[in-house]
């Protein structure tokens, strides 16, 4: 009975796909996709079925949700259309050399970057989990360059999306079914693509054995919906007419120049002889009299390429992050922010603060541990930590505990101020390879007394072992 039910479900899915191909052609073309021609290769026709099925459903639901999700979906659709164009090209042409192949793949690569950039530019979006699911998996479009296992690569990207789609399901499961359907439609694109690859491109994109070597993408959709740019601007105005008077002057100058050249060797008769006392290298006194030499304009020369053996690449600014990933709070690449707050904390959670500059962060509640890594001018205020607060590879860091913390570890850090509360006076301060460390103890009046952590030590051999003691700097 169960087998019969499964068979019925499979038949229903097959019928639904056929209906999508036959009855949604208008909608399909409305999104800018050209329908398969009768002579198209089987794997191009199969890809069109994917576009007409799960992709069309994903676009439809994204349009219903609207906003950033709809905009993102349109970018994804453009990438899929570019991929279709590559498939058409591969079905008609032979595979080019690697350097030419990269040119064919460039439009798809650029579209992938655009999808990812859109997520980074809209971190404040209410639909950020939707954008993240797409951004983390859109690189699946790169399967065309993956050999010999493009299918597993797509599955890996699909799994990356599920981390965020699970968040969408958790948030909207009992609120809005439309978002649940969106998750199913989007993930089905990649599962269907895996099946498609397994059937037609198991070990990599299949190219034609005949025809010309591919030079450019074929089968790109036409019209404004194809994602192409605006038409080129009209040509500029023609150049102004040439002045006849200036032309005659130039002609006269040119004639005079040729007349001088035609003199041949006799032209040197007008040159003046230079005696030794007029030469600066024979008469040093001339150098002192002449003063600084003014150089005339340099003749034009084509710019020469830089010959530096190791040019430094431009520094790429990483996006700022403040999010909960599993049980880890990630606070990364924050700059010049003074009001960061994490208040939805649990005992099993940890906080990892990385590459933050001139930033203040407050962590409320009780968490397991905090790590500060590679930060500069960071101010950290926290309530309670049951494990350890670790500061490593940082400069000019100030931490203040409002409740209790058992251990503060300072490693490879220059400049650290630790403000303790009355409940954390028994805190252990463990330091290594660090300098300018101070512990501040609260007073009855509400102020703090500052005590430096020793940095200079004296070690002696007592006959049996090394004995190390703290030394004070004299003077």
UniProtKB/Swiss-Prot annotation:
Coiled coil: none annotated. Residues 313-453 form the C-CAP/cofactor C-like domain. GO terms for biological process: actin filament organization; cAMP-mediated signaling; cell morphogenesis. The modification N6-acetyllysine is found at residue 81. The modification Phosphotyrosine is found at residue 31. Keywords: Acetylation, Actin-binding, Cell membrane, Isopeptide bond, Membrane, Methylation, Phosphoprotein, Ubl conjugation. Residues 218-228, 243-255 have a biased composition (Low complexity). The modification N6-methyllysine is found at residue 287. The keyword Ribosomal protein does not apply. It holds the Pfam family CAP_N. The modification N-acetylalanine is found at residue 2. Residues 216-255, 278-318 are annotated as: Disordered. It is found in: Cell membrane. Directly regulates filament dynamics and has been implicated in a number of complex developmental and morphological processes, including mRNA localization and the establishment of cell polarity. Homodimer. Binds actin monomers. This is Adenylyl cyclase-associated protein 1. It comes from Macaca fascicularis (Crab-eating macaque). The gene is CAP1.
């Amino acid at each position: 009975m169960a087998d019969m039910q499964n068979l019925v479900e499979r038949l229903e899915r097959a019928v639904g796909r056929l209906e999508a191909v036959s009855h949604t052609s208008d909608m399909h073309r409305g999104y800018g996709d050209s329908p398969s021609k009768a002579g198209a290769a089987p794997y191009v026709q199969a890809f069109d079925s994917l576009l007409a099925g799960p992709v069309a459903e994903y676009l439809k639901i994204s349009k219903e949700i609207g906003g950033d999700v709809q905009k993102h979906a349109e970018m994804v659709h453009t990438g899929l259309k570019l991929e279709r164009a590559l498939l058409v090209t591969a079905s008609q042409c032979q595979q080019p050399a690697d350097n030419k192949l990269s040119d064919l793949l460039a439009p798809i690569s650029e579209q992938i970057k655009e999808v990812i950039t859109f997520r980074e530019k809209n971190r404040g979006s209410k639909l950020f989990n939707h954008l993240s699911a797409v951004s983390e998996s859109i690189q699946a479009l790169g399967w065309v360059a993956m050999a010999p296992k493009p299918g597993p690569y797509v599955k890996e990207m699909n799994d990356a999306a599920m981390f965020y789609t699970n968040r969408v399901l958790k948030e909207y499961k009992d609120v809005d079914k439309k978002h649940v359907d969106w998750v199913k439609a989007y993930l089905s694109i990649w599962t269907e693509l895996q099946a498609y690859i397994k059937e037609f491109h198991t070990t990599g994109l299949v190219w034609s054995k005949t025809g010309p070597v591919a030079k450019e993408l074929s089968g790109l959709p036409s019209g404004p919906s194809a994602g192409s740019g605006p038409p080129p601007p009209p040509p500029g105005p023609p150049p102004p007419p040439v002045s006849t008077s200036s032309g005659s002057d130039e002609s006269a100058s040119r004639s005079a120049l040729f007349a001088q050249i035609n003199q041949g060797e006799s032209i040197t008769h007008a040159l003046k002889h230079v005696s030794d006392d007029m030469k600066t290298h024979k008469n040093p006194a001339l150098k002192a009299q002449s003063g600084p030499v003014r150089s005339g304009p340099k003749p034009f020369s084509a710019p020469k390429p830089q010959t530096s053996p190791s040019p430094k690449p431009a520094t790429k600014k990483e996006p700022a992050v403040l999010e909960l990933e599993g049980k880890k709070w990630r606070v990364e690449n924050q700059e010049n922010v003074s009001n960061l707050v994490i208040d939805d904390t649990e005992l099993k959670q940890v906080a990892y603060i990385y590459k933050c500059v001139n930033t203040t962060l407050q962590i409320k509640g009780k968490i397991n541990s905090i790590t500060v890594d590679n930060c500069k001018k960071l101010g950290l205020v926290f309530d309670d930590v049951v494990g350890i607060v670790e500061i490593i590879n940082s400069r000019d860091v100030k931490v203040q505990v409002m409740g209790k913390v058992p251990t503060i570890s300072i490693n490879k850090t220059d400049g650290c101020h630790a403000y303790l509360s009355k409940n954390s006076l028994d805190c252990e301060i463990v330091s290594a390879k660090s300098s300018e460390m101070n512990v501040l103890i609260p007073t009855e009046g509400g102020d703090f007394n500052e005590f430096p952590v020793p940095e200079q030590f004296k070690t002696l051999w007592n006959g049996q072992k090394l004995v190390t003691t703290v030394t004070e700097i004299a003077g």
